[in-house]
Protein backbone atom coordinates (compact mmCIF):
# COMPACT_ATOMS: atom_id res chain seq x y z
CA UNK A 1 0.00 0.00 0.00
CA UNK A 2 1.47 3.40 -0.92
CA UNK A 3 2.15 6.14 1.58
CA UNK A 4 -0.71 8.53 2.35
CA UNK A 5 -0.67 11.70 0.23
CA UNK A 6 -1.44 13.91 3.23
CA UNK A 7 1.82 12.79 4.88
CA UNK A 8 3.99 13.73 1.91
CA UNK A 9 7.15 12.02 0.65
CA UNK A 10 9.78 10.74 3.08
CA UNK A 11 13.46 11.68 2.87
CA UNK A 12 16.12 11.27 5.56
CA UNK A 13 17.29 14.58 6.99
CA UNK A 14 20.99 13.79 6.57
CA UNK A 15 20.45 12.99 2.88
CA UNK A 16 18.38 16.14 2.34
CA UNK A 17 21.16 18.22 3.90
CA UNK A 18 23.78 16.64 1.61
CA UNK A 19 21.59 17.27 -1.46
CA UNK A 20 21.08 20.93 -0.52
CA UNK A 21 24.85 21.39 -0.03
CA UNK A 22 25.59 19.75 -3.39
CA UNK A 23 23.07 22.01 -5.16
CA UNK A 24 24.45 25.13 -3.46
CA UNK A 25 28.05 24.29 -4.42
CA UNK A 26 27.21 22.88 -7.89
CA UNK A 27 29.14 19.79 -6.83
CA UNK A 28 29.31 16.82 -9.21
CA UNK A 29 30.80 14.41 -6.63
CA UNK A 30 28.59 11.40 -5.83
CA UNK A 31 26.59 11.57 -2.62
CA UNK A 32 27.10 8.34 -0.66
CA UNK A 33 24.01 7.11 1.17
CA UNK A 34 22.65 4.05 2.93
CA UNK A 35 19.10 5.45 2.88
CA UNK A 36 17.32 3.24 0.34
CA UNK A 37 13.94 4.24 1.84
CA UNK A 38 14.15 7.90 0.83
CA UNK A 39 12.03 9.17 -2.05
CA UNK A 40 13.68 10.88 -5.03
CA UNK A 41 12.86 14.60 -4.93
CA UNK A 42 13.01 17.10 -7.83
CA UNK A 43 16.02 18.75 -6.12
CA UNK A 44 18.04 15.57 -6.76
CA UNK A 45 17.70 15.64 -10.57
CA UNK A 46 21.13 15.80 -12.18
CA UNK A 47 23.00 14.57 -9.10
CA UNK A 48 24.85 11.28 -8.79
CA UNK A 49 23.88 9.36 -5.67
CA UNK A 50 25.81 6.26 -4.58
CA UNK A 51 23.16 3.93 -3.11
CA UNK A 52 24.25 1.06 -0.86
CA UNK A 53 23.02 -2.35 -2.02
CA UNK A 54 24.25 -4.31 1.01
CA UNK A 55 27.75 -4.88 -0.33
CA UNK A 56 28.88 -1.76 -2.18
CA UNK A 57 27.66 1.67 -3.24
CA UNK A 58 26.10 1.74 -6.71
CA UNK A 59 26.37 5.16 -8.42
CA UNK A 60 23.06 6.26 -9.95
CA UNK A 61 22.54 9.43 -12.01
CA UNK A 62 19.12 10.81 -11.07
CA UNK A 63 16.87 11.95 -13.93
CA UNK A 64 13.32 13.32 -14.11
CA UNK A 65 11.68 9.92 -14.61
CA UNK A 66 12.95 8.74 -11.21
CA UNK A 67 11.15 11.46 -9.19
CA UNK A 68 8.65 9.92 -6.78
CA UNK A 69 10.35 6.52 -6.66
CA UNK A 70 12.48 5.26 -3.78
CA UNK A 71 16.28 5.19 -4.06
CA UNK A 72 16.38 1.47 -3.28
CA UNK A 73 14.60 0.68 -6.54
CA UNK A 74 17.69 1.66 -8.53
CA UNK A 75 20.30 -0.41 -6.66
CA UNK A 76 19.62 -4.13 -7.09
CA UNK A 77 20.39 -6.18 -3.98
CA UNK A 78 20.08 -9.69 -5.38
CA UNK A 79 22.09 -11.32 -8.15
CA UNK A 80 20.56 -14.21 -10.07
CA UNK A 81 23.26 -16.64 -11.19
CA UNK A 82 20.93 -19.05 -12.99
CA UNK A 83 19.23 -22.29 -12.08
CA UNK A 84 21.19 -25.42 -11.31
CA UNK A 85 22.05 -27.56 -14.33
CA UNK A 86 20.13 -30.79 -14.91
CA UNK A 87 22.36 -33.70 -13.85
CA UNK A 88 20.49 -36.24 -16.01
CA UNK A 89 21.44 -34.51 -19.23
CA UNK A 90 25.17 -34.80 -18.49
CA UNK A 91 25.15 -38.63 -18.61
From Swiss-Prot:
User: Short name of one Pfam family for this protein?
Assistant: Ribosomal_S19
Q: GO terms for molecular function, please?
A: rRNA binding; structural constituent of ribosome
Name its GO BP terms in alphabetical order: ribosomal small subunit assembly; translation
Q: Under which name does UniProt file this protein?
A: Small ribosomal subunit protein uS19
Write down the Gene3D superfamilies for this protein, in alphabetical order.
Answer: 30s Ribosomal Protein S19, Chain A
Alphabetized UniProt keyword annotations? Ribonucleoprotein, Ribosomal protein, RNA-binding, rRNA-binding
Name the family.
Answer: Belongs to the universal ribosomal protein uS19 family.
**Keyword Transferase annotated:** no
What is this protein for, i.e. what is its function? Protein S19 forms a complex with S13 that binds strongly to the 16S ribosomal RNA.
Origin species, per record, is Halorhodospira halophila (strain DSM 244 / SL1)
For this protein's source organism, the top of the classification is: Bacteria, Pseudomonadati, Pseudomonadota, Gammaproteobacteria, Chromatiales
Q: Pull one GO CC term from this UniProt entry.
A: small ribosomal subunit
Amino acid sequence: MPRSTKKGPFIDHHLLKKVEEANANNSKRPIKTWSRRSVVMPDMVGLTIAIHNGRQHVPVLINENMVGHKLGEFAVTRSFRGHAADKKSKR
